[in-house]
Amino acid sequence: MSLIKSISGIRGTIGGKPGDGLSPIDIVKFTYAYCATLPSRKPQPNGGKYKIVVGKDARLSGGMVENLVVGTLMACGVDVVRIGLASTPTTELAVMFAKADGGIILTASHNPRQWNALKLLNDKGEFLTAAEGQAILDLAAAEDFNFADVDDLGHITEHDYTDEHLDAVMALEAVDVQAIKDAHFKVVLDAINSVGGIIMPRLLERLGVECVKLNCDPTGDFAHNPEPLPKNLTDLSETVVREGADLGISVDPDVDRLAFICENGEPFVEEYTLVSVASYLFERAAAIAKKEGRTLAEVTAPYKPVSCSNLSSSRALRDVTEEYGGEYEATAVGEVNVTTKMRQTGALIGGEGNGGVIYPASHYGRDAMVGVALFLSNLAHKKMKVSELKRTYPEYHIAKNKIELSDKGLIDRILEEMKKEYAAEEINDIDGVKISFESKRQWVHLRRSNTEPIIRIYSEAPTLAAAESLANEVIAIAERVINDQN
């Protein structure tokens, strides 16, 4: 059994004793704490009562968790908009569409089928701040309950916001619907037997794309490991080649992450999902600026020609941004950190290297539907194969390693030693320690795990061998620190 409580929500394996797994008791406690802190986040509801949107992915435990969450919300005197099976970005947008005061997404994202989670949203359909999340954790731990009287119980309404979500995607100025239709694309979609199998085929149909469905029945019985990594997408790769498709599309169970497969069955690599979309947006804006004699900033307004991603994401985003005269900003790991920086800088595009695309013209949340529509627009304009498109971007490779420690106290010592060892290089310590070697176009990022005595190590270089070599170099330094303590 596992239960992980964090400022972004609560997740765990279903079953077990309270506090050991995601039990009914934990679900009720956490939902109550979310309700009880509503007035501190939003002193006045939009209507007579506070109203919360609840959406879920297709996990086997989704119905049970949904009933507990909805019942607890009603018991707190909160009205509920139950939207049923829905992607994470659909639920986020539904908060705005319904003029609700918040939302709860029931999904454990890329975690296996035995996991589920509650992810909490504010009245903008965005994740809560660290302070807001901590207040909920504190109240849940206090177990000081006070529920509504019978005359003040909340009520339920039901609505499917899939069409409203798709309407919003189709209406985006940068989505060239006609160009996509004229290209007559054929794609293979792997939706992991979750909600992507509901919404993504409908988007592709509206874009005039022929869709071969793979694992698109939303049973929640995941056909393979749900994280959209190349090693989990062999069936998709083989089907793309067999069907003679233009590309393959893979989404995770809640459809906020996205990965592509080239027409030859090779992975496009999820790090390059955001890179490709950003390159399209900046190239498009630069072309308009040149044609109309305007500045890049004038074309991208009301947004700035800025891109954002976290410290562990590929340098390729920075490269393509600067190629067209834009600026790049790095953030701490975590979607809320990326969206916060995007708001501060007015960024045009942002996201994370795990295939998460955040396009503020739609909303401040990762959205695979937006990512697909922008990627297909890019592909339609470029008139080239996906494998050829991939080769137009700077080539980088990321190696992922970790150091397991018996003493969590060693983490800070190791990170400090890295800063001393590489004092002559560019260092960023907003989230662990990232060391950049500009002349070699390499970097290494060491960051602590929030739940385990582990340092995660991400390194990137123009070749995988160089990335692994850099990781081994910092691991050797870490081992030296560990041995000095023994």
Predicted regions and their residues:
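An N-terminal, well-structured beta->alpha segment
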Residues: 1-71, 75-76, 155-187
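Gly/Ser/Thr-rich active-site loops/lids in small-molecule metabolic enzymes
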Residues: 213-215, 266-285, 368-377, 381
